[in-house]
Amino acid sequence: MPKMKTNRAAAKRFRKTASGKYKAGHANRSHILTKKATKRKRNLRQQNHVRAEDAGRLDRMLPYL
């Protein structure tokens, strides 16, 4: 059986935690930041946790993480 391919786009965006969950950075924080509130930008710095419904898809996309 051949090796499964890792989805490279997903591999660059998601990290797996020690407990097996996935985390990623928030969107909307690369440009056009002047109109966004400081509190909103500060909260966007935090890591975003992936919901359980989407974790199964990531398991298939990232078989070796």
Swiss-Prot record:
Skewed-composition ranges (Basic and acidic residues): 50-65
Extent of Basic residues compositional bias:
10-44
The UniProt GO MF terms for this protein read: structural constituent of ribosome
Q: What does the sequence similarity comment in the record state about its family?
A: Belongs to the bacterial ribosomal protein bL35 family.
Task: Provide one Gene Ontology cellular component.
Answer: cytosolic large ribosomal subunit
Q: Which PANTHER family does the entry mention?
A: 54S RIBOSOMAL PROTEIN BL35M, LARGE RIBOSOMAL SUBUNIT PROTEIN BL35M
- Keywords, alphabetical: Ribonucleoprotein, Ribosomal protein
Query: Alphabetically, which GO biological process terms does the record hold?
Result: translation
Which NCBIfam families does the UniProt entry name for this protein? rpmI_bact
- Note whether Cell inner membrane occurs among the keywords: no
The record's listing under HAMAP family reads:
Ribosomal_bL35
What domain of life is recorded for the organism? Bacteria
Name of the protein = Large ribosomal subunit protein bL35
- Record keyword Ribonucleoprotein present: yes
